[in-house]
Amino acid sequence: MKQIQPIALTNDEALVLQQITENGEDDVIGLSRGLSMSRSQVAKQLDRLRAKKLVTIKATCGDLWVRASKRGRQLVRYMWPEMAPAY
């Protein structure tokens, strides 16, 4: 497996990425509830994660659905090797 370059994540970014990876896919409202963060906080973290190419965001029927990108899944496996992904 190709090694990924070190990526700096804040605690909130890491929590959001971990939650998305555990769920396989989630919407902003579900993430907000699951993480006990406001929607604006979640949206801010998602913008940062998308800029780092760790998540993909798809707009459908007024909702934003988020998935971890391949790079994001690799990073989660590196950070939490014991975690079993949902996909």
Label the predicted regions.
Residues 62-70:
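Minor-groove-contacting beta-hairpin "wing" of winged helix-turn-helix DNA-binding domains
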Residues 50-60:
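A short, conserved structural fragment
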Residues 1-2, 73-87:
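Amphipathic alpha-helical dimerization/coiled-coil segments
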Residues 1-16:
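Short alpha-helical segments that sit at the start of domains
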Residues 18-22, 80:
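Short, locally clustered residues in the helix-turn-helix/winged-helix DNA-binding domain
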Residues 25-34:
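Short acidic, hydrophobic short linear motifs in intrinsically disordered regions
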Residues 36-51:
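Short amphipathic alpha-helical interaction segments
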Residues 18, 29, 47:
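Residues within the helices of the helix-turn-helix
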